Every structure is written in C-alpha cells, then in structure tokens.
Amino acid sequence: MKTVSVKEIYRQTEQYAGQSIRVEGWIRTLRASKAFGFIELNDGTFFKNIQIVFDEDLHNFSDVSKFTISSAIIIEGTLEITPGAKQPFEIKATNVELEAHSHKDYPLQKKRHTFEYLRQIAHLRPRSNAFSAVFRVRSIAAFAIHQFFQEKGFVYTHTPIVTGSDAEGAGEMFRVSTLDFKNIPLDEEQQVDFKKDFFGKETSLTVSGQLAAEAYALAFKKVYTFGPTFRAENSNTARHASEFWMIEPEIAFADLQDNMELAEDMLKYMIRYVMEQAPEELEFFNQFVDKGLIDRLNHVANSEFGKVTYTEAVKMLQESGEEFEYPVEWGHDLQTEHERYLTEKVFKKPVFVMDYPKDIKAFYMRMNDDNKTVAAMDLLVPGIGEIIGGSQREERLDVLTDRMKQMGLDEEEYWWYLELRKYGGVKHAGYGLGFERAIMYLTGMANIRDVISYPRTPKSAEF
C-alpha cells in the first residue's frame, strides 16, 4: 500500500477519495469513547492535521485509545469525504500501528503555550502550530530567494565563515582561536602572539560576506551570498541575534539606483512567492499573531516603493510636530521610531532613504560629490522599519584609501580588497537583507528568537 503525505491528500483530495491509503505521522490530539475515537495526525508535510477515525472493530482498539500525544503511528485506512463536517475529509482506519511511544510528560499538551516557554524547549517547538508555520515559511522564503537570483542569472557564491578582516569596521566580532587560554603566547611587546595561533594571524567569525562577494561580482558581474553571519554585539533586544543569516547580492556595472531596483524586485518576489506557497500558514499568522498581516503584505507587494534622501527625511521628521523619544538631528542614525514614522505615517508604503552622512556609514560606501554623504540606502517597511541596507561601493582607489585612513583602518589588512580597484574595478553596488528580519515581516512574529531554529543571543547558547 502506498504511503501518502498529508500534503498530497489536501492538494489532490479527489485522486485519493475512496482509496485505501497509508499515512505516517505523530499524534497531535486523541480522544476516545467506548466505541470509537478520533486522532489528529500531523506528518510534517503540511500545516494542517488530518483526522483519523477508529472504532471498536479495530483489533487493537483498546491500545490505540490509550496512545499518548506525540507518539509516532502508521495508519492504514480509507479516505472518506465529509462535506457536512468541520473537516473536509477523514481517514477511516483499518489498521493502526505504534511506531514510537511518547512519554506522558511530553511538554506540548493541547493548550496554548507562550513563545517565552517554547524558547526553553527549542528542540520541541517545531511541533507546535506556530513554529511549524514559522519554519515552513522560512524554508519557502529561502527557496524563493535562491529562485529569484537564479532566474536573473546570479552566481551563488560561498564566502568564508572564518575571516581575517572586519567587513563593517565596527570591531564587534567573535574571535576564532585554538590558543591555550591557560598559557597564551606573548610577543616581544607582551601582546598576544597570534602568529602562534592556528591560522598564524588574528581571525574571527564573519560579520558579512560582502567584501569577498565584491571580488566575485568583479568576475561574474552578478553574484549573491546566503549564509550565516555573526555579531558580538551585546544587544539583548527583540530585533538582534548574535548569529543570523544574510542575503548579500553584489552587482557590477551598477549604481545606487540599480541597487534599489534589485532590492525592491527581490522583496516583492519573496512576498508573492510565500503568499502563493504558504496560504494556510499566513492565514494562521493573520488570525493569531498579527491581524493586519495579509493586508500589509499585499500592500507591499503591490506598492511602488518611495524614495527620499536622508537630508529630506530628517527635515520631514523635524517638521512633523511628532514627539520622538530620540531627537532627530542631521548626522545621527535614524532610530526605529523615526523609520516607522516615515514609512507608516508620511509615505504609507515602503520607502528607500538614500545618501546618508559619511560619518555614520561604513568605509566602503561611495562618496557623493558633496563630500558629506555617501551613496547608501536603507529600505524601510511598515511595521518594522529598516529591513535592507546597502550602497554603491567606492571603486576609486584613492578615495577609498583616504577614507580608510580617516577611519583608522589598516590598509595592509585589506590589501586584497584594495587590489580589486587596480584591476578593472568598475562601479558596483550591493545590499544586505537580514533573513530573520524578513521572516519576522512575513509572519508578524515580534521576536527574532522565534524565527531562527536555535537562537544565539548574549548569555544564551543552550541548544
């Protein structure tokens, strides 16, 4: 007898109606009386469960009636259409086998659990409705990203996780070392002698694949990375994690306008794809997590994104009459409250903020003609604020080295990056999308810890 997935049954119901089929999965709920019982079964292939009906004709009816939540079972039976019932169909069981027993102390019983509680059992939370939906959406969104770039002819590039350079110049990096902490070698100046370390130099976990991706963009024209990045930033907030995934495309022969166009196309593609492929999950989020979610996603997918310079945005905020927690001043980063005001109250749609002051942006961003601002952009979306950050990269070697000197960066450390400018270093641009923030936006989940399987945050690496 063919084993059929629950997803196949929901998607191709007519094909299996009246047929004898076999399903495998875990018990979500079970209730039984003296003569019959009902099992809600989930096999992991679909958000919804399938109902199994069993009665006293079953040879092991008494045993099945006592099966516990999360026990793994194999069902054989007939798929029956039930048009007048709560569920569209059910399986009338002819045989039920226990494959793996679940102890009675299984922590996910039939009640609503808080997200805080579920974080304490991160190894079991994918079995809950909310996290089943979150991680299926995450999978679908990841596929959408790859499909979008592959359809556009981008080369998927794998950049190093262990690096000897700081792509952001912020210094918030996790050290990678095999030195004996109890006997650390020192050099003549009594500093740590990293020449004795595994790589012969100071190394860290990457904060971004951008610099390495730029090298490949100057060979393949269009590339993207999609992988884990790490920030040793002691921010214990709902929006920050120490380990997260980044999507970082880089395009050669491109300026800031090309960059913004690509970012807009990518975000819309991802939203539309997830809405098409995960309607049940999004309906769940819309009902239980964020009641305006589907309307907001539709609005973003069908809006033409706005554009405003940083200087214009600051003026709008200062003249708004709104009382912000953080004062708005030219030369300071926009805070989340400022970003949300712009996208939710002023533009009422996603908006790109461009041309930021050079002093609040990274060394590699292209200097504008005013020598005060750089060709940088952030994409702000309603409900979250900044979701994508990017820039046109500085391709002029002399301007780039001057900027690095001003920022106190060691040119020797970036020798290979500077060399890219010597050998056909054409104008190019790119951006970064924090994947977890995208999943927060797609699902309405408010905490980054709830959209990554095993969150890594300050003082937390339990699993």
Swiss-Prot record:
InterPro entries documented for this protein: Aa-tRNA-synt_II, aa-tRNA-synth_II, aa-tRNA-synth_II/BPL/LPL, Asn-tRNA-ligase, Asp/Asn-tRNA-synth_IIb, NA-bd_OB-fold, NA-bd_OB_tRNA
GO cellular component assignments: cytoplasm
GO molecular function: asparagine-tRNA ligase activity; ATP binding; catalytic activity, acting on a protein; nucleic acid binding; transferase activity
GO-annotated biological processes: asparaginyl-tRNA aminoacylation
Keyword Nucleotide-binding carried by entry: yes
PROSITE patterns named among the record's database cross-references: AA_TRNA_LIGASE_II
Subunit structure: Homodimer.
Gene field: asnS
Keywords assigned: Aminoacyl-tRNA synthetase, ATP-binding, Cytoplasm, Ligase, Nucleotide-binding, Protein biosynthesis
Subcellular location: Cytoplasm
Alphabetized SUPFAM superfamilies for the sequence: Class II aaRS and biotin synthetases, Nucleic acid-binding proteins
EC number: 6.1.1.22
Catalytic activity of the protein: tRNA(Asn) + L-asparagine + ATP = L-asparaginyl-tRNA(Asn) + AMP + diphosphate + H(+)
Annotated source species: Alkaliphilus metalliredigens (strain QYMF)
Protein name: Asparagine--tRNA ligase
